[in-house]
Amino acid sequence: MEKIPMTRAGYDQLDEELRELRSVQRPAVIRAIAEAREHGDLSENAEYHAAREKQSFVEGRIKELEMILSRAEVIDPTRLNGSIKFGATVTLVDEDSEEERTYQIVGEAEADLERGLLNIRSPLARALIGKDEGDSIEVVTPGGGKSYEIISIRYV
């Protein structure tokens, strides 16, 4: 099976979510199902069906997290340097708007653009891999092409 690269912070976040699902949410759903069963006829019991649906979601997410964490390859970005690779924190300037943005290149399971965590498989991350400070890149987006200049690369 293919390894899933991720940072220690990303691994810890997913592991904490898994613990929460197993120790808090799963038991709560089981209690909700038991309570709903006490109300009698299950065929028209909305509480029962809602609890079963929630159980399905919780169990599915537990399986997904177990699979991701079993295949995880934790990479320590502080041990890296040089050109851009997984784990790099990159500051870019949009060459059109002059807007500065900072992203850390992370694994798919921990990506969150709002927090500046860029999926390594995204078009922007793929364009950045292997580049150095001062390089310019072109990225094709649904809204058209964008040009960025790489201002800094850090491994933190």
Curated annotation (Swiss-Prot):
User: What GO annotations for molecular function exist for this entry?
Assistant: DNA binding; RNA polymerase binding
Going by the entry's taxonomy, the superkingdom of the source organism is recorded as Bacteria
Q: State the InterPro entries in the record.
A: GreA/GreB_C_sf (IPR036953), TF_GreA/GreB_CS (IPR018151), Tscrpt_elong_fac_GreA (IPR006359), Tscrpt_elong_fac_GreA/B (IPR028624), Tscrpt_elong_fac_GreA/B_C (IPR001437), Tscrpt_elong_fac_GreA/B_fam (IPR023459), Tscrpt_elong_fac_GreA/B_N (IPR022691), Tscrpt_elong_fac_GreA/B_N_sf (IPR036805)
Q: Does the keyword DNA-binding apply?
A: yes
| Annotated coiled-coil segments of the chain | 46-66
| SUPFAM superfamilies the record matches | FKBP-like, GreA transcript cleavage protein, N-terminal domain
Provide the disulphide bond pattern: none
**Tell me, what is an example of a GO biological process annotation in this record?**
DNA-templated transcription elongation
What does the sequence similarity comment in the record state about its family?
A: Belongs to the GreA/GreB family.
User: Which NCBIfam families does this UniProt record tie to the protein?
Assistant: greA, PRK00226.1-2, PRK00226.1-4, PRK00226.1-5
- Spell out the protein name for this chain: Transcription elongation factor GreA
Origin species = Paracoccus denitrificans (strain Pd 1222)
